[in-house]
């Protein structure tokens, strides 16, 4: 089986540096043993073995009779003869039941005959002292037993003549109990007192080979993982015995333990041909060196070893399906022996003690292996099925997440779930279930009437009839805390605010209430007036669609609604001659009211519209102040401009006096006029003033037949307006919306050239700014 091109290719013949590294590894292992089991666990065993072997060498008759001259050469010849016999006996170590196999006998008989040469044996791997000295170094220089001792220790086999002529290259290496084999895992020490699990050896042979057994085989680890508290550490995992294939046949009760490298090599060879492996690939597995498998024929290994491998190529996952319970039919003679049968049956089994898995992974693997084992038991029909099944089910029923909640917490969750089932009106809260159960009851009643069979009792959900208490949430409110958080809750875990109560007099409360009520009334009036405005705007469409006889009535309704709108704007009460401006000002202070007035002005009569314009001119500074944020007043400029073209000169003069708040006579010295200043600093007020001046000048120039009194009045108004414009600083003037074109000619008739240039500069500057 072990074929090499030359003796130099033998794996035992390596350099001294590699074996020196092995010696250092042995020293580290001894140090680990001392740290683990004490300093006296494995001390001095090799020395005692050396002394006993030295005594045996002295008692040998060959060593006593040899002389100093030719004694060394004769001793080497004698050792060569003994080693030749030893090699022949080792090559015959085949199990009896394997020799009875016809296939094996045919393979043995067809071997060519090779004559061994003593010279090659003396320098081969069978050399006793020198070869082993290169392997172990100075540590075993005087420890190796002689050939006679090894020969005496071998079990006696009956002589077989035809087998003596077999090829020497097929002879297996002898088993070694004291020196490690290259490629095999190192022998680990175990606690003292562990009973050895080895084959029975004669007491005398055992005393010769190992007088005091030091490295004994520990008990095999359990098939399934131990509890989490008893699992081994990574250092302890290294001490698991993994050399059961080294020089010992497999007992039927002990499954073989393969290292991950050996398992990978075995399974890797199966990828080439499913279920088969060549003898050369099998020979490279380091765990089989020196085992009984090494002495077998390569053809026999090719037929036998393939059965130990799984039929599918590649590795099988940890949690894959279990192997088939019934083995496939075999097309070959009976197997070699119980140790290979045991290897074949146990090789695919995963050993959880060879890897360090996560506790959760171990638990899942343990459950999967128990399920596989129960399936095999059910298929084979062996064992107490009832007890094993019940115990397995009890084990699976154990919930690792049980007892995580107290009984009080469970009751609390149950109450929450029951609260959802409480209903005073189940047809409303649980409509679909109630209808479904009614259909089931009707079906059961129909079956009972037909007599098909006994009535089936159906389970019905019984909801507790508990009266619901309607609870309306009323948050705590404090005076003066509008928009602030008043209470602390789960969603708002803040400190309650200190409600600040300000003491106010009754007059202040009454006045505030009046203002609030007045604003509400104003809003109501605006909404009513808007409704009238929409109806009036719709009358044009209704007028076009109506008949001739219906149109007068529509016109009357329209006039009536227009008067109602004017009354709502002015707030004129029955029997009151002149309404107050306060009501109109309240409407104009609201943005919606300003826009509504701009839409209503075209529908009003000239007198009504002039009254609205006059009221606006009188209260323009106050309206400008209220419109500072909205700036909606410019929307009134267009309807006011259209209105001015329908007003007479007297009305325009009066409007100009109201707008500028001028005194009755120009001769009186005019004090400071804040009213006019506010109008000139607003774009709507300045634009309205310029439009009035332009329209008045047009009327004066176009109608020369006007009375002199009106002309004098207009002239005085123009002088006062020009004086105010000259007094207002240039920076205080606002940007008007529109500037008439006839302003320069207008002022040229009332002021001299110097003042005219100054006004022209201001107006041009204003026009340029615009």
Curated annotation (Swiss-Prot):
One of its GO terms (molecular function) is RNA binding. Residues 1-84 are annotated as: Region A. GO terms for cellular component: nuclear speck; P-body; PML body. Residues 7-26 have a biased composition (Acidic residues). The modification Phosphoserine is found at residues 177, 179, 184, 278. A motif (Nuclear export signal) lies at residues 86-95. It is found in: Cytoplasm, P-body; Nucleus; Nucleus, PML body; Nucleus speckle. This is Protein PAT1 homolog 1. The gene is PATL1.
């Amino acid at each position: 089986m072990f074929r090499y091109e030359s003796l130099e290719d033998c794996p035992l013949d390596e350099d001294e540096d590699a074996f020196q590294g092995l010696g250092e590894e042995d020293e580290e292992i001894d140090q680990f043993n001392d740290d683990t089991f004490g300093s006296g666990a494995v001390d001095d065993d090799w020395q005692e073995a050396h002394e006993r072997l030295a005594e045996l060498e002295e008692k040998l008759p060959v060593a006593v009779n040899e002389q100093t001259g030719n004694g060394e050469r004769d001793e080497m010849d004698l050792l060569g003869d003994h080693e030749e016999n030893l090699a022949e006996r080792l090559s015959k170590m085949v199990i009896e039941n394997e020799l009875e196999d016809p296939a094996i006998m045919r393979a043995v008989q067809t071997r060519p005959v090779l004559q061994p040469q003593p010279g090659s044996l003396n320098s081969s791997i069978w050399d006793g002292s020198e070869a082993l000295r290169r392997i172990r170094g100075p540590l075993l220089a005087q420890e190796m037993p002689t050939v006679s001792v090894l020969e005496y220790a071998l079990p006696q086999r009956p002589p077989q003549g035809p087998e003596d002529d077999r090829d020497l290259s097929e002879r297996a290496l002898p088993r070694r109990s004291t020196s490690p084999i290259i490629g095999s895992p190192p022998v680990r020490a175990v606690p003292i007192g562990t009973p050895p699990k080895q084959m029975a050896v004669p007491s005398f042979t055992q005393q010769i080979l190992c007088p005091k057994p030091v490295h004994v085989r520990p008990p095999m680890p359990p098939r399934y993982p131990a509890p989490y508290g008893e699992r081994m550490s990574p250092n302890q995992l290294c001490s698991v015995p993994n050399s059961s294939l080294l020089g010992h046949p497999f007992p039927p009760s002990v499954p073989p333990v393969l290292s991950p490298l050996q398992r990978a090599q075995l399974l890797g060879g199966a990828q080439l041909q499913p279920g088969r492996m060549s003898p050369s690939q099998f020979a490279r597995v380091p765990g089989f060196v020196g085992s009984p498998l090494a002495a077998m024929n390569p053809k026999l290994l090719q037929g036998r070893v393939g059965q130990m491998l799984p039929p599918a190529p590649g590795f099988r996952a940890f949690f894959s399906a279990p192997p088939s319970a019934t083995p496939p039919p075999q097309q070959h003679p009976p197997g070699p022996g119980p140790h290979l049968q045991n290897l074949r049956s146990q090789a695919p089994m995963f050993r959880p003690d060879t890897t360090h898995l996560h506790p959760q992974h171990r638990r899942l693997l343990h459950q999967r292996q128990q399920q596989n084992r129960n399936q095999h038991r059910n298929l084979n029909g062996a064992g107490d099925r009832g007890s094993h099944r019940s115990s397995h089910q009890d084990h699976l029923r154990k919930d690792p997440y049980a007892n995580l909640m107290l009984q009080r917490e469970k009751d609390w969750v149950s109450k929450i779930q029951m609260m959802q089932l409480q209903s005073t009106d189940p047809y409303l809260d649980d409509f679909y279930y109630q209808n479904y159960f009614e259909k089931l009851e009707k079906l059961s009643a129909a079956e009972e009437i037909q007599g098909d069979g006994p009535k089936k009792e159906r389970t019905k959900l019984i909801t507790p009839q508990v009266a619901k208490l309607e609870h309306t949430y009323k948050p705590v409110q404090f005076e003066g805390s509008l928009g602030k958080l008043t209470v602390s809750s789960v969603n708002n875990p803040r400190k309650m605010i200190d409600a600040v109560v300000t003491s106010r007099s009754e007059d202040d409360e009454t006045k505030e209430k009046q203002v609030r009520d007045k604003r509400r009334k104003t809003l109501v009036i605006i909404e009513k007036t808007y409704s009238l405005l929409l109806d009036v705007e719709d009358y044009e469409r209704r007028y076009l669609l109506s008949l001739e006889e219906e149109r007068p009535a529509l016109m009357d309704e329209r006039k009536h609604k227009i008067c109602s709108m004017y009354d709502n704007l002015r707030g004129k009460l029955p029997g009151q001659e002149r309404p107050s401006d306060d009501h109109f000002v309240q409407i104009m202070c609201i943005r919606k009211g300003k826009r509504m007035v701009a839409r209503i002005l075209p529908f009003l009569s000239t007198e009504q519209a002039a009254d609205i314009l006059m009221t606006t001119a009188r209260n323009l500074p106050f309206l400008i102040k209220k419109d500072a944020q909205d700036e909606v007043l410019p929307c009134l400029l267009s309807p006011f401009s259209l209105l001015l073209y329908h007003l007479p000169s007297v009305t325009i003069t009066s409007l100009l006096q109201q707008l500028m708040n001028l005194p009755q006579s120009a001769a009186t010295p005019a004090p400071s006029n804040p009213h006019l200043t506010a109008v000139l600093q607003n774009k709507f007020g300045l634009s309205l003033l310029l439009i009035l001046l332009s329209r008045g000048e047009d009327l004066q120039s176009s109608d020369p037949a006007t009375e002199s009194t009106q002309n004098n009045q207009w002239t005085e108004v123009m002088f006062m307006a020009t004086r105010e414009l000259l007094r207002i600083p240039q920076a205080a003037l606002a940007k008007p919306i529109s500037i008439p074109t006839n302003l320069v000619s207008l002022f040229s008739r009332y002021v001299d050239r110097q003042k005219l240039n100054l006004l022209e500069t201001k107006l041009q500057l204003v026009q340029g700014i615009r």
